[in-house]
Amino acid sequence: MAALYACTKCHQRFPFEALSQGQQLCKECRIAHPVVKCTYCRTEYQQESKTNTICKKCAQNVQLYGTPKPCQYCNIIAAFIGNKCQRCTNSEKKYGPPYSCEQCKQQCAFDRKDDRKKVDGKLLCWLCTLSYKRVLQKTKEQRKHLSSSSRAGHQEKEQYSRLSGGGHYNSQKTLSTSSIQNEIPKKKSKFESITTNGDSFSPDLALDSPGTDHFVIIAQLKEEVATLKKMLHQKDQMILEKEKKITELKADFQYQESQMRAKMNQMEKTHKEVTEQLQAKNRELLKQAAALSKSKKSEKSGAITSP
């Protein structure tokens, strides 16, 4: 009897082949609790419900610190404290200021001073490194699947040749040799056409390359789409910030304009009041001057008539 192994989620026992490699989950648990990326920190986690789109750590941080902001380095919406996410904060303390990622061109790649930590000699950020490793893993699985299928087909051909035997052996031998001779130039021409395109593949990889190349191209296109989405999100954030700044400047300008108008109105009112006061004072002085001149004239006329 074959050994049975427990699922890490439902704890029911299944054959080893029925469980997933990483999480050791059965088929039903894999469907009910898929591995998804957190909306905030972009790490993979086991989804408990369809409505839950963030991991447990981010859920706790949301309760403690509120909704996060985009990190000023990696642009991931995971900056709960300050303007940087926890990953970039720790990396900056450990490795110094960030450098430009050679894939997404963002200022979020940290140099660990170790060439073994680089990906094909390139300095990549955390997200681009994960994407590259996923592509390599999928390519490796695809090649393993292709090699196993070709090996199974070869074994079936050998079994068929053993069972056929007898008088058909010589005819099959001549047919097989002629078919092999006919197929060798085709494979050779195929390999030459691949190598002339500038690719340096070995013959074994050249025979298995079409499906693998298509898979790698699809994976690269997906990563490029993700990168473009990230850049688009970054541009949208920049546009929103600029629009916010323009709105603030407009509001400040309107406030200053209203203050200036109020000040001008107040100055005009004050000037009008001062002018009216001066005019009233001037009229009063003119009256006093007229009265003085009149009294002087009367005094002079009285002095003349008195002798």
Swiss-Prot record:
Residue ranges of coiled coil: 217-299
Entry annotated with the keyword Zinc: no
Entry's transmembrane regions: none
CC per GO annotation: nuclear speck; nucleoplasm
Recorded superkingdom: Eukaryota
Compositionally biased region (Polar residues): 169-182
Disordered: annotated segments: 142-195, 287-307
Pfam families named among the record's database cross-references: FAM76
Keyword ATP-binding: no
InterPro entries per UniProt: FAM76
UniProt keywords, alphabetically: Coiled coil
Protein family (similarity comment): Belongs to the FAM76 family.
Protein name: Protein FAM76A
Organism name: Homo sapiens (Human)
Chain's gene name: FAM76A
